[in-house]
Amino acid sequence: MTGRRSDRPLIWRLTRATLPAAVGAAAVALLRRRRRPAPEAVPEAIPVTPSYAGGSGTPLVLLHGVGGTWRVWRPVLPLLERRHAVFAPTLPGHCGAERLAAGVAPSIHALADGVAEQLDRAGIDRAHIVGNSLGGWIALELARRGRARSVVLFGPAGAWRSAARMTAVATGMRLSFVLLATQAGRAEAIARRRWTRRLLLATQVEHPDRVDPAEFAASIRAMGDSPVVAPLLRVITKNPLEHLPADPDRPIRVVWADRDRVIPFERNGLPLLERVPGAELVRLAGVGHVPMSDDPEQVARLILEVTRTADRAHEKDRGASSMTPGAQPRGAS
């Protein structure tokens, strides 16, 4: 009896961690059994592109989460482009982006290398970098390499209290991803049904009805053409985020949703803050793990507050340097 009681918490944690895969399987099974056509129109297929660039101002880079594409940032793009030259690439090995080079094993460092190359090709040296989930982890690795003017993270991956639980979470995500990838050819049919959108998006967002059906269909199709995801999720928990020294010239804001059902703050946010000393924490109410569609205005505001402050400090430093004989301006565009 004693052994059974001690096992029960672990079993419960593993069950909850693999819930996304179970939800995905249930949705697909129910969809196959339903015969009546849904009343909603089939969303038009969205063409695949490797990146997005628009707006003007200081450079701002947006990095999405595992299995996604740059399109997850669409709700906030108009709000950010008023102040910044926005560059949103799809991560290497994801739908529409370049694959990892032959012989390169999937890892956080390999993805960070690929994103750094994307920035080089786009002519971006240092930029404000914003990341969600996996994109947040990559943003921190780019900051470690000196590529960040500032960093804003929404539910960043990379740290955890329990390696066993995080491995179970990654396994659940991988199984869910593999399952939905088999349905890529039916993406539009799945996305047009409100009940499947609500079921499949329940762990990702707080307000599934705010997600455009066409965008949801595009995300399902992307899963069928993202070869890096499954092997990455097999190994992602082997090397957690390393300690990132504080830098007063590179502000970091960590935003954590109060409804994050993928990587909750208590289990993942607190250990991440221990690895990123000096980071500012903001708790965001009423949104899920991917908050851009839940509350685009709040997300944009939390980004622009940081970039505006960093840009002003940068300009002040440049002005002070220009008044000092022989001094060189700090930073680069």
Give residue spans per PLM region.
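Conserved HGGG/HGGXW glycine-rich cap/lid loop of the alpha/beta-hydrolase fold
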Residues: Y52-R99
